[in-house]
Amino acid sequence: FTSVIPQVFVPMASELAVPQNKAQAVGMVMSGLLVGILLSRVFSGFIGEYLGWREVYLIGAILMFVLWIFIYIFLPEIQPNFKGTYGNLMKSIVELVKTQPQLRLASFRGATGFAAFSAFWTTLVFHLEEAPFFVGSDVAGAFGLIGAVGALAAALVGKVSKVLSTSKIIFYSILIMLISWGFFYEFGYTYWGLIVGVILIDLGLQAMHVSNQTIIFGLDAKAGNRVNTVYMTSYFIGGSLGTFIAANAWDKFQWNGVVAVGVFFTLICLISHILFNKNNK
């Protein structure tokens, strides 16, 4: 339930940044969020392998307490933009979904992109336990360090947006994700193939994610948290769906089944962008 807290930082960064630096601010915060997710896999993999799963949660709780202190001390207090009741707030979110086609499209892209991403990361540990790898969760977690390279590279989206349109950045980002699945299919039984694929899928997802959020935060300056609520709810629903389908695909078809799931969601993401994005050229 409280894992929603980091998502509040994204609209906060957008609100605090000057207009010309909004994309860079969102990119920086989102890179931190995704790198944290990836590094947590390294952390949990090694700690779980050598100390046990309980220690993972104990150390995590201590770190969150320390982080709470830093947030309390250093983050500025921002007054809410919405002055109505909670019921009216919920109605306004529904109204945003109805009246903002770019929000709906960005949410769908985010959901399908994160579904493909989650399909890979959910089943990677199963894949590495099988031939020809025969390794444990510590090695699977170490791939998070590799993925962090792609996530950090995506922080440059803010600078790239000054050269390319957001629509084109999203298009190329989805293509990068699609290429990553090509590596997983052709070279997924080699370490180097997985490494290249991990860098590409993290780069592609993060670049698209930052671009999506740049779009939605530009829709209504006073509705940053509300549009982010719609987007991130869709995003995590997509991730849960990708996890569920990929786990079942692994049971029945092993690695090839997972690749098929990833390619399916990525293609749906690409097709929706091409068909429904009015600014796509």
Stretches with model-predicted labels:
Residues I71-T85, L275-K281:
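Helix-loop junctions on the cytosolic side of multi-pass membrane transporters
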Residues P76-S107:
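Juxtamembrane intracellular "pre-TM" segments in multi-pass secondary transporters
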Residues L152-T166, W250:
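Helix-to-loop junctions at the C-terminal end of transmembrane segments
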Residues S167-N212:
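C-terminal transmembrane helical hairpin of 12-TM major facilitator-type secondary transporters
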Residues G218-W255:
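A late C-terminal transmembrane helix in Major Facilitator Superfamily
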